[in-house]
Amino acid sequence: MKTNVDTDKFKIYSIDFFEREALSDDLFLVSVKMVNRDDRAFSQTYYLNGLEPTDLDDVSFDAPKYETTAGIDPGTIDPEEIAAQIARAKTMLPEGHTFKSVGNYTIEEAVPSDNDYLNRGKEFGGRTASFVVRFTEDGKETESSAGKTSYIYYEAQVTVGEDGQLSIEAK
């Protein structure tokens, strides 16, 4: 990502890391939202398996301003800190449940929307992090019928507070 985004032209305001498929715990792609000096917002996806990045796509609801967007420097993302957050989240799961994967991990800067209603009460410039944990209930991981098996899992949204504390909420 550091080599793909020209930070002289763009400021990144959102980074999403996604797993390949549910419960795979296999990092597959990174999606980035960024703003250029003309205040146009774009998104682009980078695949970790060697596929070419996607074309730049216009972002429809975001209306960031280049000058007032602080931007997220990919070089400041600390994988060890993220791993520690995930480890702490595992301990917050209900008893009798087992962690399986992180569905996505998001780091974003609050930017204006082009819809005034969505801007109400919003403070711009703050950075947040959140992620989705996927987990199963022990002994009830699958259900089968007619020779087909489905994996049964649950999701919870974990929010990282400014103080580093985690809160978790069922999705």
Placement of each model-derived feature along the sequence:
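Cationic-aromatic interfacial patches
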Residues: T3
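Intrinsically disordered, low-complexity regions
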Residues: I72, T76, N104, G126-R127, ...
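Exposed beta-strand-loop-beta-strand "reactive/processing" segments of non-cytosolic proteins
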Residues: D6-T45, E109-Y151
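A short, surface-exposed beta-strand/turn
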Residues: D38-A63, K140-K171
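A sequence-composition feature that detects small, non-aromatic residues
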Residues: A22, A41, A63, A70, ...
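Long, charged/polar, surface-exposed segments that mediate recognition or autoinhibition
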Residues: P53-T106
